[in-house]
Amino acid sequence: MAVVTMRELLDAGVHFGHQTRRWNPKMRRFIFTERNGIYIIDLQQTLTYIDQAFEFVKETVAHGGTILFVGTKKQAQEAVQVEAERVGMPYVNHRWLGGMLTNFQTVSKRLHRMKELQAMDAAEDGYEGRTKRETLMLTRERVKLERVLSGIADMSRIPSALWIIDTNKEHIAVAEAHKLNIPVVAILDTNCDPDVVDYPVPGNDDAIRATALLSRVISTAVEEGKKAREERQLAAAREAAGEPKSEDAPAEAAATEEAPATEAPAAEAQQENAAE
């Protein structure tokens, strides 16, 4: 079964690129034609690249990796949050903090601070002994941290790969990923640079429906990767426990059925000896 169909890509407007005056010449090979001053992306290539990105994400997650979803532009914010939360992956959909990857130790401290403030806010006497002004300042600090960091609250280490919507807008995230040799999977619109992406998906990174559809594809890959990982872990646990493999069962059953046949001649021989 196909990951996504040509009809779905067309309906979501994935084929619409930018105006011809706003393009990156490096994207020439992904462009099918030009229509009314707009570049049309070759969706046949998009389908091929989607399959490659899907398999990479699936295998990464199957081997215990995490995918960080990144998209801070308005058109991408909802899709990034919805799809990342659906499969339990971290996400950034408001603002990328410089050093979020390259200075993760400092970011971890800010995450710890956010959780402290959340615990304080949840406790009945969390603000006891503080003035209204102090309480207001702490509340503002918590809200500010949550806005930027809530999507990565459970991210204890740098991710295995990034899914990015609009590499131009998220150029800092792309640069940090490259510095740490973290693979980047991203939508490539006609104004993007394909050289900065490891697993490109040529398509429209401005339309809400397009970003939602492609983010759904990536989250589905994560979902399948998790299933594959669970199956591997279960198989390993069974092997460690010494349980027979399912394919061994028929052989054992066959051996049991054949056993009486081997004993029959022996019984007949005993009867013959007794008669003699």
UniProtKB/Swiss-Prot annotation:
Gene: rpsB
Domain of life: Bacteria
Stored Pfam families: Ribosomal_S2 (PF00318)
Keyword Ribonucleoprotein carried by entry: yes
Compositional bias annotation for Low complexity: 251-276
One of the record's GO molecular function terms: structural constituent of ribosome
Protein name as catalogued: Small ribosomal subunit protein uS2
InterPro entries xrefs: Ribosomal_uS2, Ribosomal_uS2_bac/mit/plastid, Ribosomal_uS2_CS, Ribosomal_uS2_flav_dom_sf
Keywords tagged on the record: Ribonucleoprotein, Ribosomal protein
Coiled-coil regions, chain positions: none
Origin species: Corynebacterium efficiens (strain DSM 44549 / YS-314 / AJ 12310 / JCM 11189 / NBRC 100395)
Family: Belongs to the universal ribosomal protein uS2 family.
PANTHER family, alphabetized: 30S RIBOSOMAL PROTEIN S2 PROKARYOTIC AND ORGANELLAR, SMALL RIBOSOMAL SUBUNIT PROTEIN US2M
Disordered, as annotated region: 226-276
